[in-house]
Protein backbone atom coordinates (compact mmCIF):
# COMPACT_ATOMS: atom_id res chain seq x y z
CA UNK A 1 0.00 0.00 0.00
CA UNK A 2 2.87 2.38 0.77
CA UNK A 3 4.17 1.96 -2.79
CA UNK A 4 0.88 3.25 -4.21
CA UNK A 5 0.90 6.26 -1.89
CA UNK A 6 4.48 7.23 -2.74
CA UNK A 7 3.82 6.73 -6.47
CA UNK A 8 0.71 8.91 -6.27
CA UNK A 9 2.60 11.69 -4.47
CA UNK A 10 5.46 11.47 -6.97
CA UNK A 11 3.14 11.71 -9.99
CA UNK A 12 1.22 14.55 -8.36
CA UNK A 13 4.41 16.52 -7.74
CA UNK A 14 5.65 15.94 -11.29
CA UNK A 15 2.30 17.08 -12.73
CA UNK A 16 2.32 20.28 -10.64
CA UNK A 17 5.88 21.11 -11.74
CA UNK A 18 5.06 20.27 -15.37
CA UNK A 19 2.01 22.55 -15.49
CA UNK A 20 3.88 25.33 -13.65
CA UNK A 21 6.73 25.32 -16.20
CA UNK A 22 4.29 24.82 -19.09
CA UNK A 23 2.18 27.89 -18.23
CA UNK A 24 5.29 29.99 -17.53
CA UNK A 25 7.13 29.09 -20.72
CA UNK A 26 4.14 29.19 -23.09
CA UNK A 27 1.80 32.14 -22.33
CA UNK A 28 0.87 32.25 -26.03
CA UNK A 29 -1.43 29.25 -25.65
CA UNK A 30 -3.35 30.96 -22.83
CA UNK A 31 -3.74 34.08 -24.97
CA UNK A 32 -5.18 31.98 -27.78
UniProtKB/Swiss-Prot annotation:
Cellular component terms (Gene Ontology): chloroplast thylakoid membrane; photosystem II reaction center
Keywords assigned: Chloroplast, Membrane, Photosynthesis, Photosystem II, Plastid, Thylakoid, Transmembrane, Transmembrane helix
Membrane-traversing stretches: 3-23
Pfam families found in the cross-reference section: PsbT
Localization per record: Plastid, Chloroplast thylakoid membrane
UniProt GO BP: photosynthesis
Entry membrane topology: Single-pass membrane protein
Domain of life: Eukaryota
Main location: plastid
InterPro entries: PSII_PsbT (IPR001743), PSII_PsbT_sf (IPR037268)
Assembly and interaction partners: PSII is composed of 1 copy each of membrane proteins PsbA, PsbB, PsbC, PsbD, PsbE, PsbF, PsbH, PsbI, PsbJ, PsbK, PsbL, PsbM, PsbT, PsbX, PsbY, PsbZ, Psb30/Ycf12, at least 3 peripheral proteins of the oxygen-evolving complex and a large number of cofactors. It forms dimeric complexes.
Family: Belongs to the PsbT family.
Function: Found at the monomer-monomer interface of the photosystem II (PS II) dimer, plays a role in assembly and dimerization of PSII. PSII is a light-driven water plastoquinone oxidoreductase, using light energy to abstract electrons from H(2)O, generating a proton gradient subsequently used for ATP formation.
Protein name as annotated: Photosystem II reaction center protein T
